[in-house]
Amino acid sequence: MHWRRGDIRAYLEVTAQLCQVHLRAQDAEAAWSDFEAYRNAGGEKLPASVWLDIARMLETQQNFDRARTEYQQLAEVHPNEKQAILALLGAGRLCLKRLNRPEDALRHYRAAAASPLPHLDWESNIQAGIREAEQALGKTPATVTPTKP
């Protein structure tokens, strides 16, 4: 109805809400359809919580590259929301564990570490991700084994 009246803003708002409803109902196909309709109508700033759930849904479906893209875009569009840190961690994890892109993983983890948002709850995960990405890049030894004289 909003679309037919040319009220794009209202259409985007309702479409984002529908997407959230479908995500909560675990209807991935309908949620994805809503997300695509939102994007195709020019929506660029989906609410961070909904966007994070879309990225997680894609990750669950093993659509890792698209999930990484959505995590990354979420972090760029909503840099001042806590979901941005979670998105950076998700993108870093995917780059490191699923996409074999440790340099990108390191960039995401470092961006999370540099975030001005409070993130003490995630600091250990961030630091572990940085260490693991550096190890994958050969920047630090994986383990230090004592040698016998």
Stretches found by the model and what they are:
Residues 2-10, 25, 40-48, 75-84, ...:
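Short solvent-exposed coil/turn linkers within tandem alpha-helical repeat scaffolds
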Residues 6, 26, 62, 99-100:
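Residue-level detector of the short coil/turn that links helix A to helix B
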Residues 23, 59, 93-97, 135:
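Specific register positions within alpha-helical solenoid repeats of the TPR/Sel1-like families, i.e.
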Residues 17, 53, 90, 128-129, ...:
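"A position-specific structural signal for the A-helix of alpha-solenoid helical repeats
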Residues 96, 102-120, 127-131:
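TPR/TPR-like (Sel1-like) alpha-helical repeat modules
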